Amino acid sequence: MEGLTVGRIVHFVIREWDANRINRRRTNSESIKERMAHNEWNLGAQAHIGTSVEEGEEYPMIIVKVLDKERGVVRGQVFLDGNDVYWVEAIYSHQDEPLPGSWHWVERE
């Protein structure tokens, strides 16, 4: 696949499974405050805070490893609307009709 290199930014389409994992690990400031008041928050723990994620939403992803250049299979870090990222592996390209769990090139205007 022409142009497929480490460091390239593409779009990743969120699957329901991804959305559930991301949303489950996220918290908010009120929850943290409550847990800290009762010594239920581990000192030094990183809180994942951000907007809710849904299946079909697209987020920028930086390619961190090309597994199969010919078939467009990659691993990447998805940049979410929050203070966290999400690692995906063995993700295939689907350029014609972006499907959940696939990546595609960023559209140019």
PLM features per residue range, with description:
Residues 1, 45-51, 63:
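Intrinsically disordered, low-complexity boundary segments flanking structured domains
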Residues 1-2, 9, 13-20:
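Short, charged beta-turn/beta-strand-edge "cap" motif at the junction between a beta-strand
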Residues 1-4, 108-109:
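Short intrinsically disordered terminal tails
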Residues 5-8, 27:
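Residue-level signal for functionally critical sites in structured catalytic/ligand-binding pockets
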Residues 16, 22-26, 75, 90:
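Generic alpha-helix signal with a bias toward terminal, lower-confidence helices
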Residues 21-36, 51-67:
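Short beta-strand-centered aromatic/proline hotspots
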Residues 25-35, 42-44, 49, 93-101, ...:
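Glycine-aromatic-enriched surface loops/turns that form tight recognition elements
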Residues 52-59, 64-109:
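Intrinsically disordered, low-complexity, charged/polar segments
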